[in-house]
Amino acid sequence: IEKSFHFHMVPEWEKEIIDYAKHPFWIGLSEWGDIEHIPNFYEFKHNKDVVDSNRVGFAARMETRKCPHFLQGIDSIFFTDVNDVKWWEKNINLDTSMWRTYNYKHEHLDMFMKQNWGISHSAHIYEPFGYSIFQAVDWGKIPILAHDWLPKYDYPFRASTPEQFKEQYEKICKLSLQEKRDILFPLREHLKQWDNKEQWRDRLLEIYNE
């Protein structure tokens, strides 16, 4: 994709907001710059076994930084705005013939997560936290991650281009159920360090009450 935009790509805009704020802080996965960092949180409520399916799921907005075009030609199921999918078809000439799309409604989230898909397209760039990644892992889906998301964690399936994504997808398709468990379960345990809602709440209250 030649044209993409995200505020993280405009340091001047970010600096202006930081300078304007009385008490700037960053809520995300990891520290960013010199700003005070308050880790975000995700509560693991499902802890599902691995879904042994090679269909890929995409549960995100159709932003350029989410890289939906990585899924051209791959059997996939989408949970997003159908009108945004049509925009990609019209303006980017995206081939969506291998996709099945469910229009996003929050109340249908559990229904979508229960569908028979076992691989999550989680290779999103400039991802500040990655709530949908945590969600996929919670529901037993093997994620394909971007190289810049939790880079210190030794994870075998990462992609930054459509070609890399397809390569990682094909590797996952060859795994046995137990091999998938050996990948997903340690990742889930690692992510549970961001499962502390009380810490997040208490630190925000301290700032708001200053």
PLM segments and residue spans:
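Nucleotide-sugar-dependent
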Residues: 63, 106-107, 119-132, 145-155
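Conserved active-site histidine-acidic residue motif and adjacent donor-binding/catalytic loop
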Residues: 83, 91-115, 124-127
